[in-house]
Amino acid sequence: MIQSYKNWINNSYSQIKENYVEINNLDQKLGDGDHGSTILKGLDTAVANLNIISSEDLSFFMSEISKLMRISMGGASGILMTIFIKEIGNINYDNFRLSILDIFSTTIDKIKKRGKVNFRDKSILDIYIPVYDEIFANDVIHINRILDVLDNALESTKNMEANVGRAKFLDTKGIGITDPGAFSTTLILKEFFKEFVNEKNN
């Protein structure tokens, strides 16, 4: 079971490594300019420790991975970007869909509280909520629909005015720019669903 999680982390690292420069470029327009490098650093730390953490307890394993990432990344990104990675360790394969809904719900609540952010504030929350809604509305998780929802949710952040972080000081000048955190979150969630969603898990 844990091997699938290792695959997910490795694949997420590959996607972020391929796109981190573009993510940084977006963040230069909206924030500190280093979000791509920061999430890459966190995932690099995760990958380096995948075979060092010697535990078959999934909850403990993912908690340790998320902690190492959080420390490596630091700041708000470290806190918010690792919430899902920790929570996914609580997955229940006996009822995969309901378990995913619970994990997304918990992740969304924690992002709201810790990030002081709401839906359509131009943040990672604008990725998690549409995915939750898609899974909630259907009895089966359809991978192609999830991937479409992720793409559409990411695209929608372009038209939002930022209400959090440094980007909020841009007022309407940030409209037309994709949120970098939403970009990295989309890449990571795509790799998660590609790794875990199949007929057996629905």
Where are each of the predicted segments found?
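N-terminal loops that bind phosphate or other acidic moieties
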Residues: M1-N202
